């Protein structure tokens, strides 16, 4: 069934609808028709729905963030949906609501999972929109106002507001730019399948889009995908930070999964995708997201090696037939080189080879060293790096390039094409595997070395990068006046190198011998504020930038550059 038919797929059955209606009246004490809620007629633009169960101290941060919202309290409501916490949580929530007329507490029977409380929040919502927030997270000060304005402007059914990870890394592609009308399969919507989004309340109700209730893994994926398929307009608001997603120790996502119960829930999500797409490129592209993120990463590298033997066998007993049944060659084709190998080994049930591959990956070591450094008179810093990727002290990634017959490839009319294969993988044999499985040309074309400055805040600032021809001599150039603007108060930090080689990625500190950097000296006038490269006691390279001193030198450097540019134009 095509995407355009998505709305018809998301209706709950009558028994479920009746059950939810009964629970809603009990929880809210209201008998008004649901159609009177969520229309915005009350002046409430958005209902913030928070599933609550015995919250910790960070709950105060959430409430404080709601108190700071730029949207007037009369324009939004907060629904604290208590999942049977008991005392003292009940008293704590009552105290929050006592001094805030726009806060309501829904006291619910315990379900043990956030789906049921969220559903009650949607049922009770009076706002035009619903924004889901978890009890350990918080909103940025302008979030509700900006999200509602953006949804109004684009007539959005769903708005994905920019999420910021607190103590956790988050995908970045989805938030590179605002996307008023995002499309599944074209825009990176699958990068962020959390429920921390703004939804049009009437849209959820009309399409019967609800969270599964009870202990259901990936319930957020199920809910969001149903919404994505049913939505007329999905918008991404990337220009404004909206949601702080806080990593708390012991969260459900931190625990090791139980294969026998987890993967049936994954298949339910896959069922939704297949129900709303025809076989072909779009379906393959969507399915690839879960194949890569929920299966292949669990059988890779150190993670796979560290599993107890019995757990590893249980995991493979479940995922091997799932892969054979649900993910075809079209899904594999868009995977990176390491994942294509893992997928082929899984599909062939080559368990010993999977473990050998994981051990090989776990033993990979990357090191990046400065072999030469100089300043140019124009203010540029030129570094030559050597990058080594080894395993047990030897080159880990060994390639062989051979000529192939043009009739067997998509080669040009010249009659021959060169093909590069990785020959150093510890596979027992390649018999029974796809013939071009070890061909790595596509990934080698995308090899990259990038240098970053790691700030005191932990943020990484991109300094330089390139696609190297030879990892033994990687030339990069850093222009301090382009990296730092005139008012930038950065004092520098450690230099980090991120390497992509044949589909594997590494992140390592940049090293150098002190003597190599000692010959470099201080930066010239046209580099702006004085910058110095030093090697710390452990040999790690730091860029140290003068601040707040050096203002006159910075201004002079910028002025001279502007003058030179004007002369060249003239």
Residue ranges with predicted function:
Residues 121-123, 208-213, 261-265, 284-292, ...:
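Short secondary-structure transition/capping segments
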Residues 94, 267-274, 284-288, 316, ...:
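Generic detector of well-ordered alpha-helical segments enriched in charged/polar residues
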Residues 2, 20-40, 300-570:
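Basic, ligand-binding patches in group-transfer machinery
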Residues 240-248, 253-280, 295, 306-323:
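Catalytic core of nucleotide-sugar-dependent glycosyltransferases
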Residues 101-103, 140, 163, 206, ...:
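Generic preference for hydrophobic/aromatic residues in regular secondary structure cores
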Residues 282-306:
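P-loop NTPase catalytic cores that bind/hydrolyze ATP
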Residues 2, 7, 14-18, 22-265:
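Nucleotide-sugar donor-binding/catalytic module of glycosyltransferases
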Residues 208-220, 289-291, 346-357:
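A broadly tuned preference for mixed-charge, low-complexity surface segments
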């Amino acid at each position: 069934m095509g995407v355009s038919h998505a709305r018809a797929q998301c209706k709950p059955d009558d028994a479920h609808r009746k059950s939810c209606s009964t629970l809603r009246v009990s929880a809210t004490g209201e008998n008004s028709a649901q159609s009177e809620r969520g229309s915005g007629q009350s002046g409430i633009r958005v209902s913030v729905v928070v599933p609550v169960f015995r919250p910790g101290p960070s709950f105060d941060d959430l409430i404080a963030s709601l108190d700071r919202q730029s949207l007037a309290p009369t324009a939004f409501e907060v629904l604290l949906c208590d999942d049977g916490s008991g005392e003292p949580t009940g008293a704590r929530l009552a105290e929050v609501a006592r001094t805030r007329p726009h806060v309501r507490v829904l006291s619910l029977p315990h379900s043990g999972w956030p789906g049921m409380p969220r559903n009650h929040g949607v049922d009770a919502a009076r706002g035009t929109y619903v924004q889901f927030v978890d009890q350990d997270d918080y909103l940025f000060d302008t979030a509700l106002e900006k999200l509602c304005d953006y949804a109004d402007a684009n007539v959005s059914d769903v708005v994905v507001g920019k999420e910021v990870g607190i103590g956790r890394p988050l995908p970045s592609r989805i938030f590179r730019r605002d996307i008023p009308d995002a499309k599944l399969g074209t825009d990176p919507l699958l990068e962020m399948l959390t429920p921390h989004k703004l939804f049009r309340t009437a849209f959820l109700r009309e399409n019967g889009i609800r969270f599964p209730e009870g202990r259901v893994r990936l319930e957020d994926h199920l809910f969001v995908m149903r919404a994505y398929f049913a939505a007329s307009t999905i918008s991404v608001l990337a220009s404004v930070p909206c949601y702080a997603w806080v990593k708390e120790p012991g969260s459900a996502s931190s625990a090791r999964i139980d294969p026998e119960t987890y993967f049936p829930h994954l298949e339910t999500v896959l069922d939704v995708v297949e129900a709303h797409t025809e076989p072909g490129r779009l379906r393959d592209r969507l399915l690839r997201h879960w194949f890569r993120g929920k299966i292949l990463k669990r059988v890779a590298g150190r993670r796979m090696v560290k599993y107890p033997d019995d757990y590893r066998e249980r995991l493979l007993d479940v995922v091997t037939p799932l892969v054979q049944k649900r993910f075809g060659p079209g899904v594999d084709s868009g995977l990176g080189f390491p994942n294509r190998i893992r997928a082929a080994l899984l599909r062939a049930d080559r368990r010993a080879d999977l473990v050998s591959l994981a051990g090989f990956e776990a033993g990979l070591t990357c090191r990046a060293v400065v072999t030469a450094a100089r300043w140019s008179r124009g203010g540029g810093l030129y570094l030559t790096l050597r990058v080594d990727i080894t395993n047990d002290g030897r080159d880990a990634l060994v390639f062989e390039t051979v000529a192939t017959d043009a009739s067997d490839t998509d080669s040009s009319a010249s009659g021959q094409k060169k093909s590069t294969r990785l020959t150093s993988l510890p596979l027992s044999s390649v018999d029974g595997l796809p013939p071009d499985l070890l061909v790595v040309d596509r990934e080698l074309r995308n090899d990259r070395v990038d240098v970053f400055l790691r700030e005191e805040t932990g943020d990484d600032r991109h300094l330089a990068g390139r696609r190297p021809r030879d990892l033994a001599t990687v030339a990069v150039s850093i222009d301090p006046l382009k990296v730092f603007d005139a008012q930038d108060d950065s004092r520098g930090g450690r230099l980090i190198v991120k390497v992509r080689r044949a589909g594997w990625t590494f992140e390592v500190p940049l090293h150098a011998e002190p003597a190599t950097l000692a010959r470099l000296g201080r930066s010239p006038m046209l580099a702006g504020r004085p910058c110095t490269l030093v090697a710390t006691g452990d040999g790690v390279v730091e860029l140290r930038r003068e601040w707040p001193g050096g203002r006159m030198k910075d201004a002079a450097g910028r002025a001279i550059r502007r003058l030179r540019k004007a002369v060249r134009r003239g």
